[in-house]
UniProtKB/Swiss-Prot annotation:
Transmembrane segments: none annotated. Catalyzes the ATP-dependent conversion of 7-carboxy-7-deazaguanine (CDG) to 7-cyano-7-deazaguanine (preQ(0)). Zn(2+) binds at C187, C195, C198, C201. Binds 1 zinc ion per subunit. InterPro entries: QueC (IPR018317), Rossmann-like_a/b/a_fold (IPR014729). It comes from Nautilia profundicola (strain ATCC BAA-1463 / DSM 18972 / AmH). Its cofactor is Zn(2+). It comes from the Bacteria. The keyword Cytoplasm does not apply. It holds the Pfam family QueC. PANTHER family: 7-CYANO-7-DEAZAGUANINE SYNTHASE. It catalyses: 7-carboxy-7-deazaguanine + NH4(+) + ATP = 7-cyano-7-deazaguanine + ADP + phosphate + H2O + H(+). Coiled coil: none annotated. This is 7-cyano-7-deazaguanine synthase.
Length: 222
């Protein structure tokens, strides 16, 4: 059976990407990163819950604490507040410098070891916070780098099934593939109840509302 590494944060987008990979006939090898983010424990729980749901035993949980040493992002630096006043133009302080580049590099190492032919990542360019490492152009360049820096027989395709979808279309796609959205976690700030006001919560809530579907995770405010 063909194999695919899935970068699985436990959020709605990456989980939907995992279910798409499964529907396309891949044996899923999930990779999760603990990078000292504010919601590290809650994201890890979501990851494990989703892996349990899919009966995935071969899981990679990789600790990369150096993001906290680098700082420069509200997700890893407690001295930088997570914005709660709505999604605005420009790159927000929740951007973690080159995070997806580092994630993809590690995922490529796992893929080469496991003999996987694809890496799935749930990046979204169209309806998102505007991170530069979530664009289709960036992913295409990373794929070139991965295949030029691995063994000649290694040929990995980086798949981004959601990159051009709006959030409401991602919600609808998730429902189509029977994704357990109630197990996913998107909030940047909280680990008990989603805050409802950070960029990630706002984008998620907007997506559910426009899709006409109820979001069953607990929110502090909506």
């Amino acid at each position: 059976m063909k194999k695919a590494v899935v970068i699985l944060s436990g959020g709605m987008d990456s989980t939907t990407a995992a279910f798409i990979a499964k529907s396309e006939g891949y044996e899923i090898i999930p990779v999760h990163f603990n990078y000292s983010q504010r919601t590290e424990k809650r994201e890890l729980k979501a990851f494990n819950d989703i892996c349990d749901y899919l009966n995935l035993d071969n899981r990679y949980i990789i600790d990369i604490p150096f993001f906290k040493q680098i700082g420069a992002s509200a997700l890893v630096d407690e001295n930088i507040d997570v914005p709660v006043d709505g999604v605005k133009p420009g790159i927000p302080v929740t951007y973690v410098p080159f995070r997806n580049g580092i994630f993809l590099s590690i995922a490529a190492a796992v893929a080469e070891k496991e003999g996987a032919e694809a890496i799935y990542i749930g990046v979204v360019e169209e309806d998102s916070s505007g991170y530069p490492d979530c664009t289709e152009d960036f992913i295409q360049n990373m794929q070139k780098a991965v295949n030029s820096g691995t063994k000649p027989e290694t040929n990995i395709e980086i798949k981004t099934p959601l990159v051009h979808l709006k959030k409401e279309d991602i919600v609808k796609t998730a429902v189509k593939y029977n994704v357990p959205l109630h197990l996913t976690w998107s909030c940047y700030k909280n680990e008990d109840e989603a805050c409802g006001v950070c960029d990630s919560c706002r984008l998620r809530l907007k997506g559910f509302e426009k899709a006409g579907i109820e979001d069953r995770i607990p929110y502090k405010q909506k």
